[in-house]
Curated annotation (Swiss-Prot):
This is Translation initiation factor eIF2B subunit delta. Gene3D superfamilies: Translation initiation factor eif-2b, domain 2. It comes from the Eukaryota. The modification Phosphothreonine is found at residue 86. GO terms for cellular component: cytoplasm; cytosol; eukaryotic translation initiation factor 2B complex. It is found in: Cytoplasm, Cytosol. Keywords: Acetylation, Cytoplasm, Disease variant, Initiation factor, Leukodystrophy, Phosphoprotein, Protein biosynthesis. It is linked to Leukoencephalopathy with vanishing white matter 4: An autosomal recessive brain disease characterized by neurological features including progressive cerebellar ataxia, spasticity, and cognitive deficits. Brain imaging shows abnormal white matter that vanishes over time and is replaced by cerebrospinal fluid. Disease severity ranges from fatal infantile forms to adult forms without neurological deterioration. The disease is progressive with, in most individuals, additional episodes of rapid deterioration following febrile infections or minor head trauma. GO terms for molecular function: guanyl-nucleotide exchange factor activity; translation initiation factor activity; translation initiation factor binding. Pfam families: IF-2B (PF01008).
C-alpha cells in the first residue's frame, strides 16, 4: 500500500510551519534535494523581507507625526492609528501612549485650525476660543465669570407665575451689587398695593394686610412672622366656602397658592414659614371628602392652634429649661440683635435666681438690639450695649455667646442675622463657647455653605444715615459707580458652633440630619 509523503519543516525564528503540497507526480515519493533547497531559499527571502518592514515602520510613523503638525489648509489627514500608504494597518506596538496622544492632539488642533480658516474665507463670524482655553489665564488657572450666570428661561417663568395667579408684581430696585444680582431687591417706597383693587382681587384682605406689615418691617423675626402667617391663614379658612362640584381638600390648596406668591412679593418667606405651610397643606389634603365643610374647617383651625402651641410656645419653654443648665452665677453672656427666644431664656433664668450680666451687641441699619436691651432692663437684668465693631474689645471678659437662629440647614450651618458669623468667628479666636438656641420647626433640608446663592436683600435706602439736616449717602443712585448692599442673613459654618439647644435636647450641629429624618418619619 503506497503512502503519501509530506515534507514539513519548522522555522525556529518565525514559529511558522511550511508545507509543500504534493505535485501531480509527487505522490508516493520524497522531495528531491533541489526542491528542498528551493523551499529553504524562499523562506530566507520572506524572513529578510519581514525584518526590513519592521525597521522601516518607526521611520514612517515619525514621518506621519511631522506631516500632521505641518498639514496645510488643503491636505486631508489620515485616520489615527493608520500608516500612510498601507490599507488599515495598525500602529506598531513599539509606539508609546504619550506619542499616540501627542499625535492625536496635533491632528485635532490641525483640523480645528483648518475649519476656522475655512470659516474666515467664507466671511463667517470670528472663531470662538476653544473650550480648553476659555476662561483661563496665561498661567492656566480658570477664572470665574465676573457676573453670576442666571438662566433667562427660569427668570421668565418666575415672572409669569404671579401673572397667571393674578398677583401684583413688585418692581425691582434695579441698582444692585453684581455678586447678588440674582436676588430680588425691593424698595419700601414702591407700594405693591398702590394700583390694587381689593374687592376685585383674588387676595384675601387678611393676606393683604399681612403682606404690607411684612414689607414695611412692622412684623419681623422668624417666630413672629410665622405666628402672624398662621393666624391670617385661620382667617382665610374661616371665610372659605367650597365651590360647587369641588372638594375642599383640593380647592383650598389651590386657593392658598396665590396668597403665598403675594407674600413672597412682599418679602421672601422664611424657612419656618415654609415648614408651617407644608404642614397646613398636609392637613388640608388629609381631610376626608365625607366630612362637612364646617367640621373640616374647624379641624384645620384647631390643627393650626396645636402647631403654634407645640412647635413654638412649648418648644420655647423646653429650650429655656435646657439653656438654664448652661448659665452659671457670675457669667457674662453676649447676645446679638433681637431674638425673642434668647430674651425669654435670659429673663426666665434671672427670675429663677441665676445672677449674671449681659452684653448686647447691635448693628445698623435695624438696631434690633435696642428691643432686647429694653426688655432686659425692664426685667432687672444688668446689661450693656455696644455696636458690632467693638465686640472684640469685650470678648476677653465674656464667658459664653448665646445666639438665635433664622434657620438651621441640613449640613449643620446656621442661618441668622447678618453679623452672626462674624461674632462666632471672633468668639472662636478668644476661645469663647458659642451656643445657638433654635426650635426644630426651623430645621430645613436646604444645604448652603455661603450667603451668596440664597439670601434676602433689604431696602438699600435704609443704609442712609441722617444726622440732623445732613443725610449721608443722599442721592446715591445718581452715582453710576456706587452700589449699596443691605444683606439680611449670613451663614455660620458648623465648626464655629459648639452646641445647639433645641426642645429635643442639646445636640451638635452634625445631628441636624438625624432630627430631620426623625421628623419626616413621624409625619
Amino acid at each position: 500500500m503506497a503512502a503519501v509523503a509530506v515534507a514539513v519543516r519548522e522555522d525556529s525564528g518565525s514559529g511558522m510551519k511550511a508545507e509543500l503540497p504534493p505535485g501531480p507526480g509527487a505522490v508516493g515519493r520524497e522531495m528531491t534535494k533541489e526542491e528542498k533547497l528551493q523551499l529553504r531559499k524562499e523562506k530566507k527571502q520572506q524572513k529578510k523581507k519581514r525584518k526590513e518592514e519592521k525597521g522601516a515602520e518607526p521611520e514612517t510613523g515619525s514621518a506621519v507625526s511631522a506631516a500632521q503638525c505641518q498639514v496645510g489648509p488643503t491636505r486631508e489627514l489620515p485616520e489615527s492609528g493608520i500608516q500612510l500608504g498601507t490599507p488599515r494597518e495598525k500602529v506598531p506596538a513599539g509606539r508609546s501612549k504619550a506619542e499616540l496622544r501627542a499625535e492625536r492632539r496635533a491632528k485635532q488642533e490641525a483640523e480645528r485650525a483648518l475649519k476656522q480658516a475655512r470659516k474666515g474665507e467664507q466671511g463667517g463670524p470670528p472663531p470662538k476660543a476653544s473650550p480648553s482655553t476659555a476662561g483661563e489665564t496665561p498661567s492656566g488657572v480658570k477664572r470665574l465669570p465676573e457676573y453670576p450666570q442666571v438662566d433667562d428661561l427660569l427668570l421668565r417663568r418666575l415672572v409669569k407665575k404671579p401673572e397667571r395667579q393674578q398677583v401684583p408684581t413688585r418692581k425691582d430696585y434695579g441698582s444692585k451689587v453684581s455678586l447678588f444680582s440674582h436676588l430680588p431687591q425691593y424698595s419700601r417706597q414702591n407700594s405693591l398695593t398702590q394700583f390694587m383693587s381689593i374687592p376685585s382681587s383674588v387676595i384675601h384682605p387678611a393676606m393683604v394686610r399681612l403682606g404690607l406689615q411684612y414689607s414695611q418691617g412692622l412684623v419681623s423675626g422668624s417666630n413672629a412672622r410665622c405666628i402672624a402667617l398662621l393666624r391670617a391663614l385661620q382667617q382665610v379658612i374661616q371665610d372659605y366656602t367650597t365651590p360647587p362640584n369641588e372638594e375642599l381638600s383640593r380647592d383650598l390648596v389651590n386657593k392658598l397658592k396665590p396668597y403665598m406668591s403675594f407674600l413672597t412679593q412682599c418679602r421672601p418667606l422664611s424657612a419656618s414659614m415654609h415648614n408651617a405651610i407644608k404642614f397646613l397643606n398636609k392637613e388640608i389634603t388629609s381631610v376626608g371628602s365625607s366630612k362637612r365643610e364646617e367640621e373640616a374647617k374647624s379641624e384645620l383651625r384647631a390643627a393650626i392652634d396645636r402647631y403654634v402651641q407645640e412647635k413654638i410656645v412649648l418648644a420655647a419653654q423646653a429650650i429655656s429649661r435646657f439653656a438654664y443648665q448652661k448659665i452659671s452665677n457670675g457669667d457674662v453672656i453676649l447676645v446679638y440683635g433681637c431674638s425673642s427666644l434668647v430674651s425669654r431664656i435670659l429673663q426666665e433664668a434671672w427670675t429663677e435666681g441665676r445672677r449674671f450680666r449681659v452684653v448686647v451687641v447691635d448693628s445698623r441699619p435695624w438696631l434690633e438690639g435696642r428691643h432686647t436691651l429694653r426688655s432686659l432692663v425692664h426685667a432687672g437684668v444688668p446689661a450693656s450695649y455696644l455696636l458690632i465693631p467693638a465686640a472684640s474689645y469685650v470678648l476677653p471678659e465674656v464667658s459664653k455667646v448665646l445666639l438665635g437662629a433664622h434657620a438651621l440647614l441640613a449640613n449643620g450651618s446656621v442661618m441668622s442675622r447678618v453679623g452672626t458669623a462674624q461674632l462666632a468667628l471672633v468668639a472662636r479666636a478668644h476661645n469663647v463657647p458659642v451656643l445657638v438656641c433654635c426650635e426644630t420647626y426651623k430645621f430645613c433640608e436646604r444645604v448652603q455653605t455661603d450667603a451668596f446663592v440664597s439670601n434676602e436683600l433689604d431696602d438699600p435706602d435704609d443704609l442712609q444715615c441722617k444726622r440732623g439736616e445732613h443725610v449721608a449717602l443722599a442721592n446715591w443712585q445718581n452715582h453710576a459707580s456706587l452700589r449699596l448692599l443691605n444683606l439680611v442673613y449670613d451663614v455660620t459654618p458648623p465648626e464655629l458652633v459648639d452646641l445647639v439647644i433645641t426642645e429635643l435636647g442639646m445636640i451638635p450641629c452634625s445631628s441636624v440630619p438625624v432630627v430631620l429624618r426623625v421628623k419626616s418619619s413621624d409625619q
